[in-house]
Every structure is written in structure tokens, then in C-alpha cells.
Amino acid sequence: MALNFNAIASKSQKLPCFALPPKATLRSPKFSMISTIPSGSKEVGNLKKPFTPPKEVPVQITHSMPPHKIEIFKSLEGWAENNILTHLKPVEKCWQPADFLPDPNSDGFHEQVKELRERAKEIPDDYFVVLVGDMITEEALSTYQTMLNTLDGTRDETGASLTPWAIWTRAWTAEENRHGDLLNKYLYLSGRVDMRQIERTIQYLIGSGMDPHTENSPYRGFIYTSFQERATFISHGNTGRLAKEYGDINLAQICGSIASDEKRHETAYTKIVEKLFEIDPDETVLAFADMMKKKIAMPAEFIYDGRDYNLFDHYSAVAQRIGVYTAKDYVDIVEHLVDRWKVKELAGLSAEGRKAQDYLCSLPSRIRRLEERAQEKAQGSTPVSPFSWIFDREVKL
């Protein structure tokens, strides 16, 4: 999972916000507020606390799923074992970061590093900004495992639970862990980036957490991960395509291998939601519509390097401009999931469920119209911003 940024919410990108912000509702039995610094605060260092997240998190709805729904997920454990765990690869059959990097035990190690650095010199700064952002997002993996373990009915209750849901979460995390490791080592060897600034950004991001608006609900949680895995598949696929265009076949293979993992994970998560539509269509379509109205909050939305409070917007804008992850990709994912889960064909829904169905089926065309208008308004605008990750060199947004 990991990567992604909200390609449709950034002012820097001059792209529209296509959905309503999250609202607290009386249907939720519990609410919580995380107290943080307002996003406009200038000095984190002035605080007496050793760490305070630099971004403000609004009121959060928690445990919105009715308790009796937990039984649905318990009843699906046998199904998950036979249909979801099969999408994991045995460790011995998985690629490892060392497969793509210079071998420090070989006599040609220094020459291999030199060749890697020579290839990296031909790649533009804007690409490295996006690749660094992708890597940082992957490195915040502990946050995503934490998020999955907030979901009622599927969390790992002990840290070593043998339920299929818990086994999946741990093994998924283990597979994903290779992604950040590989990109981190590549970037370190490339000599093109400021690793200390990148490492600070990773620490800030993990410390800040994330706010996916999933309300501890596995319905919402698995819709979120279905979207995210497809988005990361697209994004890593596009960084691989660009690396090939720049003549770095090794980097293209790195990105392509990560994208392949993301595709396999996407298949597993979308199968879970497909099963939920089969056995509980009303609750599932309501959860899907709710997540779309609140927007998919990207894992890196709290990204911060100690300097730039708009770093997420700036990073997202560069990714949009060079075609790694765009507003079009966002709407394509929405349309894909509506089709994949056969939302138009749902029958026997409640009145509220039918409204959610209508909303979801009309959403892609509405977003496309808004995107077209936003792109027209953005014509001719070419702002730039420095990025600490590349030694404060400026890049077009």
C-alpha cells in the first residue's frame, strides 16, 4: 500500500476537491479529538513536548460499525483463509532488495555503484522528488499496520494471532516492508538526494500517523485499502515507465517489481469487499459512498520535513505534472471499483442504500467534469518550490 497523495485536493495543483469533508454524525457512539499544532504554526521546536504532530487532525468518529456486524467477519474466517491468504507469496519465492542493488561482497561493487550513480545523473530533479515521496510513504509502513489493527472484527488481538485476518495483516506488512527498504537503499546510493532530510521526513511522518476516516470499520477499511493498493500500483508503474524513458532499466525493474506486489495486494483487498457486497450489500454500499464523500485520505497527507508545511501539496503537484499520479488516475480508480464491485447491479437495497448506489454510479462523470474545468483554469500557471530532499533545488509544480 503506501504511496499516494490526494491528487484532487491540492490547491497547488489547482485541481478541485470532489467530495465533501468528513462530518461527525450522531450514529457514531464515540468521538475523539487529537490535539495538534494548527497547520499554520511556524515553529515545532518551540514546544516543550518532545514531539507534536505538525498537522491538525479534526474530530474523529470511532467504532461506528454496529457490534453485531463483527460476527460477519468471524464467519468469514474460513473463506479468508482459502481466498485471501492465497494472494501471499512464500518468503523464499519473494524478491528481496539485494536482488536489485550492487552486491557489497563482489569485487565489482564499487564499479556497480559508479554505474548506478552515472545512470541517476540522467534523471531530472522532479522525478527524484516524486520517487523520494514514494519511498517516504512506503517507509511509514508501521502506520499502515497500526491502521489495519484498529479495525473491529479483523484486528490482530495479540500480536501473533492465528486468525486469517491477523495472518494477512502481518504477512502483507512483511511483503510491503521490502518496498521502502529497496527504494531507500537505491536513493542512498544514487547520490542525488539529501538523505538526512529524507530521514527526518520519515520520522515526522511516522510520528504524525494518518487519518483514513475508516471509523474502526472493516467495511470502510477494506474499501480504503482497495483504493490505495490500486493507486500505488498505478504510481509505481508510472515511475517505472519514466525510469525506462530516462534510460535506467534497473530502476524501471525496481519500480515494476514493487508495482507487481501492489497489484497482487489490490486483488486480495478488492475480493474482500466483493464478498461483503455479496453478503451485506446495504452496509457495504453505504460504507463505499461514505468513503467517497469524505475523499480517500492519502497516507502521506501529513508529510513534513521540518520546513515546508505545504510539502504534501507540493509533492502531489509534481507527481500530477509529470504523470505519476493524477486527478485522472483518481477518478479512473473510482470508476474501476464501481464497475469491479458491480454497484449498478445491486438489488434489494434500502432507500438509503439506493441513494448511495445512485451517488456512486454518477460520481465518476461528475468528477471528470470538475477536473476538466479545473485544468482549464490552471492553464498558464507555472509556480516553483524548493525541496529539501534535493538540497533545496527548485522544481516546477
From Swiss-Prot:
Family annotation (CDD domains): Acyl_ACP_Desat (cd01050)
A GO cellular-component term linked to this record: chloroplast
Keyword entries, A-Z: Chloroplast, Fatty acid biosynthesis, Fatty acid metabolism, Iron, Lipid biosynthesis, Lipid metabolism, Metal-binding, Oxidoreductase, Plastid, Transit peptide
Major location (coarse): plastid
Binding of Fe cation 2, residues: E176, E229, E262, H265
EC number(s) per entry: 1.14.19.2
Catalytic activity annotation: octadecanoyl-[ACP] + 2 reduced [2Fe-2S]-[ferredoxin] + O2 + 2 H(+) = (9Z)-octadecenoyl-[ACP] + 2 oxidized [2Fe-2S]-[ferredoxin] + 2 H2O
Presence of the UniProt keyword Iron in the record: yes
A Pfam family: FA_desaturase_2
Gene3D superfamilies in the cross-refs: Ribonucleotide Reductase, subunit A
Pathway annotation from the record: Lipid metabolism; fatty acid metabolism
Cofactor: Fe(2+)
Biological process (GO), any one: fatty acid metabolic process
SUPFAM superfamilies: Ferritin-like (SSF47240)
Amino acids binding Fe cation 1: E138, E176, H179, E262
GO molecular function: metal ion binding; stearoyl-[ACP] desaturase activity; stearoyl-CoA 9-desaturase activity
Xref: InterPro entries: FADS-2_CS (IPR005803), Fatty_acid_desaturase-2 (IPR005067), Ferritin-like_SF (IPR009078), RNR-like (IPR012348)
Subunit structure: Homodimer.
Physiological role: Converts stearoyl-ACP to oleoyl-ACP by introduction of a cis double bond between carbons 9 and 10 of the acyl chain.
Protein name: Stearoyl-[acyl-carrier-protein] 9-desaturase, chloroplastic
Species of the source: Gossypium hirsutum (Upland cotton)
